[in-house]
């Protein structure tokens, strides 16, 4: 997605107060599955060489719901192979851990919709929606998701997704992180809780998508990776 950064976050906002607002704002969407119990298997040699880690090693209670591993995405078909994992660059580890820790006292859990995204998948996404306002045009370098340095996340409470006002990859102005028109007060509050928690982990909001957060160096051009997502 474009490299714009989010507006300054109000760090004085009390997370637990916001969570009280959120408590009545759980969506009626079908429950999402929790991450499997047990140890997390090692990442592939290629992923390890790229500095990638499985997000469950640093956020063990993470809920993994990779949309591009299913047909529940705007392309309508799975784009990731079976066994796809949420891989992120190790530079995001401490930040994601801090964000998750900030949410736990309020009974909230991070849900990961996308993490590292292979270049060929980015190409297919842009072919489906060739509009750089909505989908980043793939280039000669990797950055953001293609470099494993951005994540698409939402929140869950008790296994139910919170109501954020849109679904993932909503190509609409109300997907803007700070949208007010067409976004209820509760939905705005839910987005603020997510944004504030991610800010505690030094993860920057991309304004155009409330679910997208960039880690350190996300906008830096890097060589395109040949790392399988499974």
Question: What residue spans do the PLM features occupy?
Answer:
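Extracytoplasmic cell-surface/polysaccharide-interacting catalytic and binding patches
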Residues: 3, 32-113, 127-208, 214-230
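N-terminal twin-arginine translocation
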Residues: 10, 29-31
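Bacterial N-terminal signal peptides
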Residues: 16-28
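Segments that shape or occlude catalytic/ligand-binding pockets
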Residues: 118
């Amino acid at each position: 997605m474009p490299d714009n950064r989010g507006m300054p976050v109000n760090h004085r906002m009390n997370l637990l107060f916001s969570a009280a607002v959120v408590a009545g704002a759980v969506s009626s969407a079908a429950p999402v599955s929790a991450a499997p119990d047990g140890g997390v298997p090692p990442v592939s040699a290629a992923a390890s060489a790229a500095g990638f880690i499985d997000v469950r090693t640093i956020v063990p209670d993470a809920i993994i719901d990779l949309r591009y591993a299913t047909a529940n995405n705007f392309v309508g078909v799975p784009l990731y192979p079976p066994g796809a994992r949420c891989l992120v660059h190790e530079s995001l580890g401490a930040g994601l851990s801090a964000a998750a820790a900030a949410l736990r006292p309020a009974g909230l859990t991070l849900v990961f919709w996308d993490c590292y995204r292979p270049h060929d998948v980015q190409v297919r996404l842009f072919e489906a929606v060739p509009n750089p306002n909505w989908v980043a045009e793939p280039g000669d370098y990797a950055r953001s998701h293609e470099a494993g340095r951005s994540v698409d996340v939402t929140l869950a409470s008790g296994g139910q997704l919170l109501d954020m006002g849109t679904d993932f990859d909503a190509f609409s102005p109300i997907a803007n992180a700070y949208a007010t028109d067409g976004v209820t007060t509760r939905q705005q509050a839910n987005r603020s809780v997510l944004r504030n928690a991610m800010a505690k982990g030094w993860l920057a909001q991309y304004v155009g998508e409330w679910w997208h957060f960039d880690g350190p160096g996300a906008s830096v051009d890097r060589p395109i990776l040949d790392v399988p997502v499974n």
